[in-house]
Regions:
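N-terminal secretory signal peptides
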Residues: 1-18, 28-32
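C-terminal segment of N-terminal export signals and the immediately downstream linker at the start
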Residues: 15-17, 36-50
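Substrate-binding rim/cap in mid-to-C-terminal beta-strand-loop elements of soluble/periplasmic
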Residues: 344-388, 452-494, 508-515
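Active-site regions of oxyanion-processing enzymes, predominantly non-cytosolic
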Residues: 49, 143-154, 160-161, 247-280, ...
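Active-site His/acidic residue clusters
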Residues: 161-170, 228-238, 257, 262-299, ...
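Secreted, luminal/periplasmic, and some membrane-associated catalytic domains
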Residues: 85, 92, 115-136, 141, ...
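Short, structured active-site-proximal loop/turn typified by the sulfatase FGly-forming signature C/S-X-P-X-R
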Residues: 62-110, 149-153
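N-terminal export leaders
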Residues: 19-23
Length: 516
């Protein structure tokens, strides 16, 4: 008789019984936490792609509000999507930067959009990011078939244009009266359906409107009121633009564009919405606020309506949700940094080294957070590398700055932070020194409230990423992915090459293929 068979038939010792019980117990625990590997999805390009990009939206918004979500909005999207809660923008984290990174699949060091604005030495002026400042092509410029259409809904022409520079139509942007205009259409020549839509969303309908908590009965105490003062209409316009009413108008316009333009029926069409309201609100309140949470719940309701409506059309679609960046919490007053607190010590340090007793010399040309620009006409080319280091170290000696990197790559710190900083440098735009404030510190914006975006820290860099559609498996993937991965992944679904300068990877695990 085989010894193995004999051992298998032998009466177990007491210790063996204990070990077997332990193994069974461990197996039961493992089973409770076991998540099966999803079956591979067939990669199929549906005829309609909807991409929702919140200008500002942290991953923790989904977790802290999850129990308040209705079944058909974010809760459904999370359950039916390939969900990446830790998608990171590993560079400066401004809205224009995030949009450009999503569209191109690369970072500012290649696409050139280092911030919402930067200093332009040649014109001695602040330069706002514009579509033609993109140094590389975007995913949405790569569509080889002219019959396949692209539409964008955004707050401004420039934000819509960063997705597909050069588009002469199909881009909708908000006007101060809360109505939308379309690029390429003369005044009064907008599509008839847009005129009808705008009549239902005129700003005047929201004057003195109370912003009630989601689900609160009429007459409840409002979170705020959209007060209208004829002497200062811009204040009302700002309140409206950051409200759930404006956000809902954008989400409704997405449906209207799909319906009116018959998208996804006879061609492969894409509509992208850049949702700016929560970004505007976040810059006022920071990431933790009852207003932010209520706006998230409002977006949840709008998302549920959109998904239900898309289902009812009976046509296959895919939907992507992400954000251009996250947000810091509102800091104490002592964590707000004015430009003078940076420029003055830097100027003193540079003067001590290079003025050589002369007076009236200024070595700082401009400081546009987080970029410091030096006066090259007051420094020799051989002096510049040393001047940059002196400037960075002078800023580092203040209580506000955590570290820095110069345009020629010097940094006192070697870590993953350096990768984020290097990704943010683009010659001629990012200045001589990039400064990183300490975590929680923000740019002073003219009042003892509000926050600034743009830092390299995770609270600004980390956003959710969700893909729902026939090509994607449902599941949660907790490993870090990058914002540069979005364009290559969507290109793979479309059967197109990744954008020309894309450095991200195809998220093959979203197709059920495992991490590549």
């Amino acid at each position: 008789m085989s010894p193995i068979k004999t051992l298998n038939r032998a009466r177990p010792e007491a210790g063996d019984v204990s070990r077997r019980k332990l193994v069974k117990s461990l197996a039961a625990v493992a089973a409770a936490f076991y998540i099966p590997v999803p079956a591979r999805a067939a990669i199929v390009r549906p005829k309609l792609t909807v991409v929702l990009i919140a200008e500002q939206f942290r991953s923790d918004y989904l977790f802290r509000n999850f129990n308040a979500f209705n079944a058909g909005g974010f809760r459904r999207l999370i359950e039916e999507s390939a969900f990446f809660p830790d998608c990171r923008l590993l560079s400066t984290t401004f809205t224009s930067t995030g949009l450009a990174t999503i569209a191109t699949g690369c970072y500012p060091s290649l696409h050139g959009i280092v911030a919402n604005r930067w200093y332009e030495s040649a014109g001695n002026r602040l330069k706002a990011a514009e579509p033609f400042d993109l140094a590389v092509t975007t995913l949405f410029q790569q569509e080889p078939e002219p019959a396949n259409r692209f539409f964008a809904v955004a707050a401004t022409e420039s934000k819509a244009g960063l997705l597909k520079p050069g588009a002469v139509s199909g881009q909708f942007f908000r006007k101060p009266d809360n109505t939308f205009a379309t690029l390429g259409a003369a005044v009064g020549k907008e599509p008839e359906w847009l005129t009808v839509f705008n009549q239902a969303h005129l700003a005047g309908k929201f004057r003195d409107q109370p912003w009630l908590p989601r689900g609160a009965p009429p007459g409840s105490f409002p979170l705020r009121s959209l007060k209208y003062d004829a002497a200062k209409p811009e204040n009302f316009q700002a309140l409206l633009a950051s409200s759930p009413f404006a956000q809902s108008a954008q989400m409704q316009l997405v449906r209207e564009v799909v319906h009116a333009e018959n998208l996804g029926l006879n061609s492969f069409d894409t509509v992208v919405a850049v949702l700016d309201s929560i970004g505007k609100l976040g810059s006022e309140t920071g990431a933790v606020s009852p207003l932010i949470d209520d706006e998230v719940l409002s977006l949840d309701a709008d998302l549920a309506t959109l998904l239900e409506w898309l289902d009812a059309r009976g046509q296959p679609y895919q939907i992507v949700f992400t954000a251009a960046h996250g947000a810091p919490v509102e800091p104490p007053t002592t964590y707000r940094v004015s430009p003078d607190e940076i420029v003055e010590p830097v100027e003193r340090a540079l003067s001590a080294e290079f003025a050589k007793g002369k007076t009236g010399f200024h070595f700082v040309e401009a400081y546009v957070y987080p970029f410091l620009y030096l006066r090259h006409d007051h420094l020799t080319p051989s002096d510049l590398p040393r001047a940059r280091q002196i400037a960075g170290n002078a800023a580092l000696a203040t209580r506000h700055v955590s570290t820095f990197i110069t345009s020629d790559g010097y940094s006192p710190q070697f870590s993953e932070w350096n990768t984020r900083a290097r990704n943010s440098l683009y010659r001629g735009r990012s200045g001589d020194v990039l400064l990183a404030y300490r975590p929680g510190f923000v740019e002073f914006v003219g009042a003892d409230r509000g926050v600034s975006y743009g830092s390299l820290w995770n609270y600004d860099a980390q956003v959710p990423l969700l893909f729902k559609g026939p090509s994607f498996v449902a599941g949660r993937f907790d490993h870090i992915v990058e914002m540069t991965d979005i364009a290559p992944t969507l290109a793979a679904v479309a059967g197109m090459p990744a954008p020309a300068a894309a450095t991200g990877r195809v998220l093959s695990e979203a197709f059920g293929e495992g991490v590549s």
